Amino acid sequence: MSVAILTSLPPQWLSILAVFLLPILTLLLFRGKDDNQKKGLKLPPGPRQLPLIGNLHQLGGQPYVDFWKMAKKYGPVMYLQLGRCPTVVLSSTETSKELMKDRDVECCSRPLSVGPGQLSYNFLDVAFSPYSDYWREMRKLFIFELLSMRRVQTFWYAREEQMDKMIEILDGAYPNPVNLTEKVFNMMDGIIGTIAFGRTTYAQQEFRDGFVKVLAATMDMLDNFHAENFFPVVGRFIDSLTGALAKRQRTFTDVDRYFEKVIEQHLDPNRPKPETEDIVDVLIGLMKDESTSFKITKDHVKAILMNVFVGGIDTSAVTITWAFSELLKNPKLMKKAQEEVRRAVGPNKRRVEGKEVEKIKYIDCIVKETFRKHPPVPLLVPHFSMKHCKIGGYDILPGTTIYVNAWAMGKDPTIWENPEEYNPDRFMNSEVDFRGSDFELVPFGAGRRICPGLAMGTTAVKYILSNLLYGWDYEMPRGKKFEDFPLIEEGGLTVHNKQDIMVIPKKHKWD
């Protein structure tokens, strides 16, 4: 979704807004600037601002690219005024480390954004909730009850079931092409849906198809670039004119209806007891538990389910498809990746088992390189400063929204040799990891706000990639060449390849 919200309004509305609001907001903007100068603060450098909109006019449909271009001129700590929101963008390893390690205490909150706020039932979740005692307790429950390594292992049945379906599709496809992008997204949806709602519910195709459409609409809501976020007073009016407000309400109502239906099904005393508890079962157990530090309601359950689906499907699926796209475009690299997987696992197996994935060291390199060049969320979920602090020698005031441009960090030539080249081998003898201690690579963030679903997400990514590389060799449809496969970034909160992967899978023949 474009950040340049005002361009979506008819010219006559812009004129009306300017006449009524320009004098007031101009006074506020310049008074704020004068106050900072009087205090002797050293704010980060940044581009000049316009009255009323600040720097919004300089951002388009790919804000992470716009931020990267501006940072080349203004540096790795850059200040922008997005409407009424003071904003800082960090674009280097050093500054991201300062934010998420050295200044984590002061800057680990979240801005109160309208889309995430509504979808999280007024910030009852873990991903978007501001820092507080409530958030700390909820995060403990979330990790211990739902995302611990013990729980991740429990959910292997869902991954294996969905992989068996994928194997059946790919084995029977030749000589016809398959839309692998679509199949990967369907597989991730099937895994997360089964883990969250259970086999019985997610096996209902009509329910699943409808829910998938609703989930796709929620991704637009989670984009922070809505007018109401930048203009607290008149932004809601602007969103109502553009239709964004009605769309947000419609999407929330739709997804809430699905969550309510699933919870009621799980509360039915006549429901057959499943072999393995799904996430809704676990959360309902917590609802009934009187010993928790706070009372868990249906809204808490729904907010956590939203985190599970939004964080579990798109980010994993785009990582898998980007990795496969890069390998497909480079046949020599694809051959090496397949040989490494097959050598580690051995011949003539129906599928790569979960316990075998850890033996495939080259898969780790592929995943890391994909996170570097194609972080699934190019602009990490924004931080929000609670106290005055300094980053990169500049003053960061309370109430500042702070973005980490993970995409820009992956293109830094001072850190990465030939950053435009996709080269998993760069990680062969490297200790750099993505679990929050190495700030060269932070696709999941770091510090208090590191993504709690890291283990579950990377487990699925490595498992699916290993199997796709192990079982089949791939041909391009007639008239297409591997080298000509386009890599075009598209999206909002998450960024995927605009071009779907259309390939002809051919079962690998062992010597």
UniProtKB/Swiss-Prot annotation:
User: Listed GO molecular functions?
Assistant: heme binding; iron ion binding; monooxygenase activity; oxidoreductase activity, acting on paired donors, with incorporation or reduction of molecular oxygen
Q: What is its EC number?
A: 1.14.14.41
Which chemical reaction does it catalyze? Answer: (1E,2S)-2-methylbutanal oxime + reduced [NADPH--hemoprotein reductase] + O2 = 2-hydroxy-2-methylbutanenitrile + oxidized [NADPH--hemoprotein reductase] + 2 H2O + H(+); (E)-2-methylpropanal oxime + reduced [NADPH--hemoprotein reductase] + O2 = 2-hydroxy-2-methylpropanenitrile + oxidized [NADPH--hemoprotein reductase] + 2 H2O + H(+)
Q: What class of enzyme is it?
A: oxidoreductase
Q: InterPro entries from the entry?
A: Cyt_P450 (IPR001128), Cyt_P450_CS (IPR017972), Cyt_P450_E_grp-I (IPR002401), Cyt_P450_sf (IPR036396)
- Where heme binds, per the record, is at 451
Q: Where does the sequence pass through the membrane?
A: 10-30, 304-324
GO CC entries: endoplasmic reticulum; membrane
Cellular localisation: Microsome membrane
Membrane topology note: Multi-pass membrane protein
Which UniProt keywords are present, listed alphabetically?
Answer: Endoplasmic reticulum, Heme, Iron, Membrane, Metal-binding, Microsome, Monooxygenase, Oxidoreductase, Transmembrane, Transmembrane helix
Cofactors (names): heme
What's the domain of life for this entry? Eukaryota
Per its UniProt record, what Pfam families does this chain match? p450
Please give the family membership noted in the entry. Belongs to the cytochrome P450 family.
Record's protein name: 2-methylbutanal oxime monooxygenase
Gene symbol?
Answer: CYP71E7
